[in-house]
Amino acid sequence: MRINPTTSXPGVSTLGKKIPGRIAQIIGPVLDVAFPPGKMPNIYNSLVVXGRDTAGQQINVTCEVQQLLGNNRVRAVAMSATDGLTRGMEVIDTGAPLSVPVGGCTLGRIFNVLGEPVDNLGPVDTRTTSPIHRSAPAFIQLDTKLSIFETGIKVVDLLAPYRRGGKIGLFGGAGVGKTVLIMELINNIAKAHGGVSVFGGVGERTREGNDLYMEMKESGVINEENIAESKVALVYGQMNEPPGARMRVGLTALTMAEYFRDVNEQDVLLFIDNIFRFVQAGSEVSALLGRMPSAVGYQPTLSTEMGSLQERITSTKEGSITSIQAVYVPADDLTDPAPATTFAHLDATTVLSRGLAAKGIYPAVDPLDSTSTMLQPRIVGEEHYETAQRVKQTLQRYKELQDIIAILGLDELSEEDRLTVARARKIERFLSQPFFVAEVFTGSPGKYVGLAETIRGFQLILSGELDSFPEQAFYLVGNIDETTAKAMNLEVESNLKK
């Protein structure tokens, strides 16, 4: 972190002495720049092209040095469109890597890859900035203690618990509740952990980014009246931007998250949507730089690029960054190098199911497909592990019996199987939960359910103590006590109807 009172356009450091060069060649978003002998910029230094195009319009393009070519030339990748640039234009070496604003001033605001606000809410305090390229924390700084990151969401905490400082892959198509789940996690970490969140939109649709921003304002995650009380910072590098911007926007978001972890000593939630677009942008840049492609046309540095990003997402003795990354799987091929490289870094996977969403069970997290390395007796304890395994066994048996039920009906099942089906259906409904951020749509208040309460509830269902309760009593409630109250209300209502 650098206290930097001298920034030009937000995010570009001018601490170093300005050294001018000239554009020698332009190949799309890639520029070759010639500098005076002995005045060559370093790799990752930020270069600024300032001038006027042929129509007299002002141009300000920031680039990042990627290669030193020899003959006093460097090759740089532009972070914005290169329209209007011409050979011979002056290029300034800022003498430092790209730096972005960090700290409380980022909350409630939307930034681009350069750390410039793009939400028309005025300038941001840029006195405290941090370079986007940093080393991962040293071994001695790491917190190696395995601890569960409680989300207050029953299905996640019980069956696929998140690791504090871990990385979670979020798999889900359109319309299954990915955005609502993301917003609920942002809301819950702020309330239960006193933490903040950073959302990195990497190569996503501009419309989706706008929708997320509007929904966050509606649900109070972003506080319009008092912007400083907001719980999230947003960093966007959309699909229409050059590959350089899409490749670096993840690092911009991560840099903002690192400040909250290292300086403010907070637990931070970092969302990256979509991590595949980070790889895709890297592949485009690699081809533009003339590197030989590797397997399936990806960049030869795929593992290095992924590792340098993922290794910075970790727990230290100061705080933690827990990352939830949306993973697009090209053509549903899990062996594709991009998702395969991502899987190597994940501690847990949360799979959203269209089938559950169609049943109206939200969050539509698939309890059988979602996994976690944390679900071990020595980490979560025997009671939690046993309960989770029994829940999974019951749901798996129900899944196996569904074909028989569809053909022959429930009456053809044995007494034991009928009991299993009844309990599985109650478990399925009890895995649903009203969300705080969905209150404006559903009208029912959100519920945060602690892990101990979650385990107790599922143990009561599995033990058969609640077999007499109707299935409806388990749907969209918080803890098991609410189920009991709902069952009594349903009984009273049915008696009144009689």
UniProtKB/Swiss-Prot annotation:
Keywords for this protein: ATP synthesis, ATP-binding, CF(1), Chloroplast, Hydrogen ion transport, Ion transport, Membrane, Nucleotide-binding, Plastid, Thylakoid, Translocase, Transport
GO cellular component term, pick one: chloroplast thylakoid membrane
Membrane topology: Peripheral membrane protein
Source organism phylogeny: Eukaryota, Viridiplantae, Streptophyta, Embryophyta, Tracheophyta
Assembly and binders: F-type ATPases have 2 components, CF(1) - the catalytic core - and CF(0) - the membrane proton channel. CF(1) has five subunits: alpha(3), beta(3), gamma(1), delta(1), epsilon(1). CF(0) has four main subunits: a(1), b(1), b'(1) and c(9-12).
Gene Ontology BP term (one): proton motive force-driven mitochondrial ATP synthesis
Claim: Cell cycle is one of the keywords in the record: no
Entries under Gene3D superfamilies matching the protein: 2.40.10.170, Bovine Mitochondrial F1-atpase, Atp Synthase Beta Chain, Chain D, domain 3 (1.10.1140.10), P-loop containing nucleotide triphosphate hydrolases (3.40.50.300)
GO molecular function, one term: ATP hydrolysis activity
Name of the protein described by the UniProt record: ATP synthase subunit beta, chloroplastic
EC number(s) recorded for this UniProt protein: 7.1.2.2
Role: Produces ATP from ADP in the presence of a proton gradient across the membrane. The catalytic sites are hosted primarily by the beta subunits.
Reactions that this protein is recorded to catalyse: ATP + H2O + 4 H(+)(in) = ADP + phosphate + 5 H(+)(out)
Binding site residues for ATP: 172-179
InterPro entries noted in UniProt: AAA+_ATPase, ATP-synt_VA_C, ATP_synth_F1_bsu, ATPase_a/bsu_AS, ATPase_alpha/beta_chains, ATPase_F1/V1/A1_a/bsu_N, ATPase_F1/V1/A1_a/bsu_N_sf, ATPase_F1/V1/A1_a/bsu_nucl-bd
Location of this chain's protein in the cell: Plastid, Chloroplast thylakoid membrane
Entry's family note: Belongs to the ATPase alpha/beta chains family.
Entry-linked Pfam families: ATP-synt_ab, ATP-synt_ab_N, ATP-synt_VA_C
Domain of life of the source: Eukaryota
Gene it is expressed from: atpB
